[in-house]
Every structure is written in structure tokens, then in C-alpha cells.
Amino acid sequence: MGFDIPEPFKWDASFEVFYKKLDDEHKAIFDSIFAVCNGNNADNLKKMVDVTANHFSDEEGMMKSANYADFDSHKKKHEDFLVVIRGLSAPVGDDKLHYAKDWLVNHIKGIDFQYKGKL
């Protein structure tokens, strides 16, 4: 998509959106994808989906409270990603893991960064 995927796949300060709750949740999504890469089983996949869905709910709640202008299109991107990851089964193929990593990196830096200072 555009931004480089970090190796090892870990959150770093370049992903900071400056809302502690959201930064902590982004870290947790990174960790959950990393966990699937290293222990490609149904439990880790379920945790990845749950952590991601919970984060999206929290982030969307903050956006809604702030009357964030791009809420609808942002929410749609979340929904589309959830459809993909909820459709996965373990073991997850390398192509799908790459997709999840790429999506997260580019979503945070390309989309989430647009709400910095607006929530």
C-alpha cells in the first residue's frame, strides 16, 4: 500500500497518534498479529480479531463523541477489515498475515493520523 512494514513487527513511536488509549490499543493489535505469526493457531487468531474489534469500537466512540468529519468512511474501512479477518481460519496463510500487517501499518499512518488533534 505505501508504508514499510516494520521487522520485527512491533509498534514504535512512528505509529503514535497521541491518544494514550488508542496508542495502547494499536500496540495490542501489533502484538496480536505478531502472536499469530509466531503461534499460528485458533486461540491467537481469535484474540487478534477480538483485540482489533474492541479497538475499532473504542476509536469509533471517540470519533463519534468528537463529531469527527470522516467518521463514516473511517468506520467503513474498519468494517471491511473485520470482514476479512473474521473470515480467516488457523493456520493463517503467509499472504493473509502480510495483508493484516500491511493493512494495519497503512491504516494507522495513512488514515488514523488524519484524526490527530481532532478527537
UniProtKB/Swiss-Prot annotation:
Signal peptide: none annotated. It comes from the Eukaryota. InterPro entries: Haemerythrin, Haemerythrin_Fe_BS, Hemerythrin, Hemerythrin-like, Hemerythrin-like_sf, Hemerythrin_metal-bd. CDD domains: Hemerythrin. Keywords: Iron, Metal-binding, Oxygen transport, Transport. GO terms for molecular function: iron ion binding; oxygen carrier activity. Fe cation 1 binds at residues 26, 55, 59, 112. The keyword Transport applies. Fe cation 2 binds at residues 59, 74, 78, 107, 112. The keyword Iron applies. Hemerythrin is a respiratory protein in blood cells of certain marine worms. The oxygen-binding site in each chain contains two iron atoms. Belongs to the hemerythrin family. This is Hemerythrin. It comes from Paraleonnates uschakovi. The lineage of its organism: Eukaryota, Metazoa, Spiralia, Lophotrochozoa, Annelida.
